[in-house]
Amino acid sequence: MRNKICKELNNTDIGKLVNLCGWVDRRRDHGGVIFIDLRDHSGFLQITINPDDGADLFKQAETLRNETVIMVSGIINERPKDSINTNLSTGELELKVKDLQVLNQIKNNLPFPVSIHDYENTKEELRLKYRYLDLRRGKLLENLKTRHKIIKVSREFLDNFGFTEVETPLLTKSTPEGARDFLVPARLSNGEFFALPQSPQLFKQLLMVGGLDKYYQIAKCFRDEDLRADRQPEFTQLDIEMSFVSEEEIISFNESLIKKIWKEVLNINFNNAFPRMSWQAAMDNYGTDRPDTRYEMLLKDLGGVLGDIGFNIFTKAIKAGGYIKSITVKGGNSSISNVRIKPGGDIFQVAQDAGAGGLAFIRVKGDELETIGAIKNNLSEEHIADILKITEAKDGDLILLGAGDKQIVNQSLDRVRQYIAKDLNLIDKSKWNFLWVTDFPMFERNEDENRYEALHHPFCSPKNIKSKDSDKMQKEIENSIANAYDLVLNGMELGGGSLRIHEANLQREVLKTVGLTDKEIDEKFGFLIEALEMGAPPHGGIAFGLDRITMLLIGADSIRETIAFPKNQQAKCLLTNAPSNVSESQLKELDIEITIDE
């Protein structure tokens, strides 16, 4: 049907007969000549039709609506000098049409303009409902091509190092991994269910037990969790696993992979090794294990200075084992008013939404500290000197303080730090600040359920477990550091991994630590325990979020911009109206009865 696409055309094609196919992006009638911007997947070309080309052809061109699918044949000409479009690669050319065929008419009015000339801020819900039209706008297609390039570069890199791509099952066993599973009823086993995998974690470990040595997969994963801009119920991981490797070898190898992706996609070189930071240092200084290191405002611990000054909120926090922490906003006295950090203010609200009761503040004015009387009246000169030394605050700076539960203080000041950095334009958006976060605790305590939860997952190997006695081992495990690592970029987690447990006894003890009984372990993970007893090699790996990597590389705000047909924030596909009801006969086949609570 066609012998060229738009972007292939150049000055060497002048005078040649070409066939092109595409959409009418825009039609204009100037002085009896019809100009049509023809759009295909590669770009644009102006085509011209005038009455001298034939009455029928001209009449047909007059009726063309935007987005009509056409095929045209004609001669490539050089545009007149005064009509050259320097914004297009084909802006010096035009096609003088000899023949035009309509391949498909527009039946209905379009729900939104597709032409880049008419591009408007279309609501995302409408874009998702008519995703095929949104794709035609070009930007999404470019995003998908970038995604494809990332996958292509990754495959080539891993193939060159002897990795084997293996597909693991999508219908698998429901196991407790953190988020809710998507369940699939098994018709041939009434009352039983498959689960869609939250990750290929256990299967890739079993591949290592099977001797594969080096594995990767572009893996579809599914998690039934609350959504946000960087989450979808189904998402894609670049999943990697290796045998007989150390933590250092895994980090070094995967750092090279990430550098290769950035080089091939953005032509950016990173010559130095990515910096590293322990989990504890990240929490102490940033309040999060995903720190954005492009700007300062580090958290500072003021518990030793302010815990005993007699201010009730501070006293209670320290007595309860909590924190008093601060961030310093340089020049904050002039850029942030009291209204914004008091109840009803936007910064106060950010802290409150993160669980804090509020914010205290201190303004540095010369050698004096300005704050509420209950704090200021109890500050000695020594207190003031210590505060200024720890916070590194100078004249004109604003110190914001949080006090209370450790987790809430860290979380609220982290959110406030991010909010202020964006608000005051403190972030250098040209920077790519990669960071390896290492030495995660194996577990965190769930006080509500009176048990431990794995910070990553219960298949991470703990460091320095020496005891073989079950009771002593259990105590060591509870307080251990994991052989785990995350790669963070500009405050977002790109991927995470660990060395895995390859000894059956240790794996059983770790699963007991998260609250499983021996019976539950055998029911849920018996196949894994049995495999580890049959000569499992030391192994480890990592999984990168492909959607998130693509989002960062294209500069998008949501991973929905990297996926051809994403779900909305209610986990619905607006294009197909999924999920939807199914017929009674389908439910009957599965012996499923639906009851809905009023």
Curated annotation (Swiss-Prot):
GO terms of molecular function: aspartate-tRNA ligase activity; aspartate-tRNA(Asn) ligase activity; ATP binding; nucleic acid binding
InterPro entries, alphabetized: Aa-tRNA-synt_II (IPR004364), aa-tRNA-synth_II (IPR006195), aa-tRNA-synth_II/BPL/LPL (IPR045864), Asp-tRNA-ligase_1 (IPR004524), Asp-tRNA-ligase_1_N (IPR047089), Asp/Asn-tRNA-synth_IIb (IPR002312), AspRS_core (IPR047090), GAD-like_sf (IPR004115)
Binding site for L-aspartate: 177, 223, 456, 500
Site (Important for tRNA non-discrimination): 30
Annotated transmembrane regions: none
One GO cellular component, as annotated: cytoplasm
Binding-site residues for ATP, renumbered to this chain: 223-225, 232, 493, 545-548
EC number: 6.1.1.23
Keywords: Aminoacyl-tRNA synthetase, ATP-binding, Cytoplasm, Ligase, Nucleotide-binding, Protein biosynthesis
Family assignment from sequence similarity: Belongs to the class-II aminoacyl-tRNA synthetase family. Type 1 subfamily.
Subunit-structure text: Homodimer.
Protein name, as recorded: Aspartate--tRNA(Asp/Asn) ligase
